[in-house]
């Protein structure tokens, strides 16, 4: 059975989350498309929030 590719916006969110948990700057967002950039930044915010509250460590 074929695997479906993940939605691009879901992938952008996940990559942003990983960047936030890893402590990267939000200025390093690789997306120029507004929708993808918004999703990436949303994931980044959640990742940073999780790191600050102690859910994740580097």
UniProtKB/Swiss-Prot annotation:
Q: What is its main location?
A: cytoplasm
Xref: InterPro entries = Ribosome_modulation_factor, RMF_sf
UniProtKB keywords = Cytoplasm, Translation regulation
Q: Which Pfam families match?
A: RMF (PF04957)
Q: Which family does it belong to?
A: Belongs to the ribosome modulation factor family.
Q: What does this protein do?
A: During stationary phase, converts 70S ribosomes to an inactive dimeric form (100S ribosomes).
* Protein name as it appears in the record: Ribosome modulation factor
What is the scientific name of the source organism? Answer: Shewanella amazonensis (strain ATCC BAA-1098 / SB2B)
What gene is behind this protein?
rmf
């Amino acid at each position: 059975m074929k695997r479906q590719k993940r939605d691009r916006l879901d992938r952008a969110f996940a990559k942003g989350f990983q960047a936030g948990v890893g402590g990267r700057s939000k200025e390093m967002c690789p997306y120029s498309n507004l929708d993808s950039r918004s999703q990436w930044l949303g994931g980044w915010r959640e990742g940073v929030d999780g790191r600050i509250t102690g859910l994740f460590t580097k």
